[in-house]
Amino acid sequence: MREHRPIIALDFPSFEAVKEFLALFPAEESLYLKVGMELYYAAGPEIVSYLKGLGHSVFLDLKLHDIPNTVKSAMKILSQLGVDMTNVHAAGGVEMMKAAREGLGSQAKLIAVTQLTSTSEAQMQEFQNIQTSLQESVIHYAKKTAEAGLDGVVCSAQEVQVIKQATNPDFICLTPGIRPAGVAVGDQKRVMTPADAYQIGSDYIVVGRPITQAEEPVAAYHAIKDEWTQDWN
């Protein structure tokens, strides 16, 4: 099931900065928000409770990667926060991912990171010593994620079609690195526009700086949302 709201990456250093940003939006507007490591480490679990209390959906992007028992225990705690979605690194292995699923339960979506969108094929081959193509690595991780019983993966939009072919059409593909046409790509190596991401089959898109650093964030958000959903029936 595709998500009609672009997920806004709350890449802010403090609780107060988040409050100031969200104050720009109408109180009745329900958003889908990503809390990453920077914000979670700065504000703690209370940031999730605060966002849920405002009626927003929360993707807690912590990319857990540890031994299975530790990840399972951590996921039990995250499940109590009421997050709507969270993630692990697929590189942690099938047993770790199964443990994460068991710890989190079935109320929240659980997805895995394949290769970060900041990773190029040359970087992967040199630093991870994975001597395949980037796409082959991503497909391998996606298959293992499906095998472990997770809901989907984080991946580049360019990889969505091959991942769904290798797994199943309902396997979630969440796509970061989304940039409207004409916006600087920043540190992302593999990017795509919202309209292109829709056409290629992404289920969720994540957008950060083009919204949070825009002169008019609310207008930027709705422009991206309109582009993302313009061809929906």
UniProtKB/Swiss-Prot annotation:
Top EC class, one word: lyase
Recorded coiled-coil stretches: none
Any GO BP: 'de novo' pyrimidine nucleobase biosynthetic process
Pathway: Pyrimidine metabolism; UMP biosynthesis via de novo pathway; UMP from orotate: step 2/2
Enzymatic reactions: orotidine 5'-phosphate + H(+) = UMP + CO2
Sequence similarity: Belongs to the OMP decarboxylase family. Type 1 subfamily.
Protein name as catalogued: Orotidine 5'-phosphate decarboxylase
